[in-house]
């Protein structure tokens, strides 16, 4: 009896691991990625996602200025993003460094050196990033339906500070804009509704 119970438990765990890493269809990836985009721009965004072998690929070529990223099937929960096209060199470099095995701090430091050296360009004007997320239990990977999703807003303003923007470095109320990484190449305004 113990052996049967163990085998059932092991099979359930293995199934959950397999299901967690299953790559949704291109249609589902596009549908969920577009949840991060402003409603009026969703029809013409470029969308990147993952092939069945989990390689990062172009799923749909768009005609507007926004690039959306589908959820990473290797991560728990749902996290999709959409950003202004001028952020693509910064975002792509982050993906490359992550693929090389770097952690968050190493990626931050490497990109900072590259921005200062002029080999990595940041936008010259403010640039938006939208991130939509949900817990695993609230995302159906077979239909793309999401319950209890959360959308946060980021506006990149390289080298801006609290003094240059009038924004605090920490929010003191829900939904209050604040500046993160002030004074760095990666300074950005956070808005968490």
Language-model features and meaning:
Residues 1-21:
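Bacterial Sec-dependent N-terminal signal peptides
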């Amino acid at each position: 009896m113990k052996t049967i119970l163990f085998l059932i438990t092991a099979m359930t765990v293995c199934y959950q691991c397999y299901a967690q890493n299953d790559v949704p269809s291109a249609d589902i990836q596009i549908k969920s990625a577009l949840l991060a985009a402003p409603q009026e721009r969703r029809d013409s965004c470029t969308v990147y996602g993952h092939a069945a072998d989990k390689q990062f690929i172009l799923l749909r070529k768009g005609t507007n200025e926004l690039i959306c990223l589908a959820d990473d099937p290797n991560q728990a929960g749902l996290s999709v993003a959409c950003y202004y096209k001028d952020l693509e060199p910064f975002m792509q470099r982050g993906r490359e460094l992550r693929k090389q095995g770097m952690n968050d701090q190493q990626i931050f430091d490497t990109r900072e050196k590259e921005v200062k050296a002029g080999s990595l360009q940041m936008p010259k004007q403010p640039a938006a990033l939208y991130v939509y997320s949900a817990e695993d239990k609230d995302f159906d990977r077979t239909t793309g339906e999401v319950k209890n999703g959360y959308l946060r807003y980021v506006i990149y303003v390289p080298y801006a500070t609290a003094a240059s923007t009038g924004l605090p470095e920490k929010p003191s109320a829900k939904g209050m804009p604040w500046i993160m990484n002030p004074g760095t190449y990666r300074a950005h305004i956070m808005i968490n509704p």
